[in-house]
A protein has these predicted regions:
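Hydrophobic/aromatic beta-strand elements that line small-molecule binding cavities or substrate pockets
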Residues: 1, 51, 83-86, 108-114, ...
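Beta-strand/loop substructures that line and gate deep hydrophobic ligand-binding cavities in soluble
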Residues: 1-21, 122-125, 132-180
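Hydrophobic pocket/interface hotspot
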Residues: 20, 27, 60, 64, ...
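Hydrophobic ligand-binding cavity/cleft-lining segments
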Residues: 37-81
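A generic structural micro-feature
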Residues: 41-43, 88, 102-106, 140-145, ...
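Intrinsic-disorder/low-complexity, polar/charged segments enriched in Ser/Thr/Lys/Arg/Asp/Glu/Gln
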Residues: 44-50, 57, 93, 107, ...
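Glycine-rich portal/gate segments that line the openings of hydrophobic small-molecule binding cavities
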Residues: 82-136
């Protein structure tokens, strides 16, 4: 909040209406680049995918925060989300099973680290067992046990949202997991 409209207009003109968020985003990119200097060939770069949706940012964000939405789109085509439980808060968990057409179950979990509505969710993603303990990918045992995952939601036009997902290796990833990723 700004004390006057003039103060807000000056801040907008300067390009800093979101406070220090832009600086912190640039610091994040710079620090990661600096930290990557001199790393071994086993240090992997993040895997990033973006897509723009013809839907408001608040709705796209909400589709990641409520089971009533997630059960309609989460997982590969032909897979049904079953037994979902969601505790959407930092430290909370989304635990679920994906059921294949033959009835097989594959469990997964997300442990939330940071939630900044409606712009960002940071979590640790992994396969799991039915109890919610970390598991291995059923078809790729060398796949990383955990991935740091960041979802960002950016309003790019009136009623449109650019969604980006970024997967990164955790510091504790083994050399085999790093090569697989």
């Amino acid at each position: 909040y700004f004390p006057t409209a003039e103060a807000r207009n000056a801040t907008v003109k300067f390009g800093a209406v979101e406070g220090g968020e832009q600086n912190l985003a640039r610091l994040d990119a710079y620090a990661q680049a600096e930290a990557g200097k001199g790393r071994s060939s086993l240090e992997n770069k993040p895997f990033i995918i973006s897509r723009t949706y013809d839907a408001p940012r608040e709705l796209v964000f909400e589709c990641f925060t409520k089971v009533k939405h997630m059960k309609h789109w989460w997982g590969p085509r032909g897979i049904k989300v079953v037994k979902p439980s969601l505790d959407f808060r930092p430290g909370g968990m989304f635990h679920y099973a994906m059921q294949t057409p033959d009835g097989s179950l594959m469990w997964g979990r997300q442990i939330y680290r940071e939630i900044t509505p409606p712009s960002r969710i940071v979590l640790v993603n992994s396969f799991s067992d039915e109890a919610g303990d970390i598991g291995r990918h059923p078809g790729a045992p060398d796949w990383p046990a955990e991935l740091l995952t960041t979802f960002t939601f950016e309003e790019v036009a009136s009623g449109k949202t650019k969604f980006t997902v970024r997967w990164e290796l955790m510091d504790n990833a083994s050399d085999v997991e790093r090569e697989t990723f």
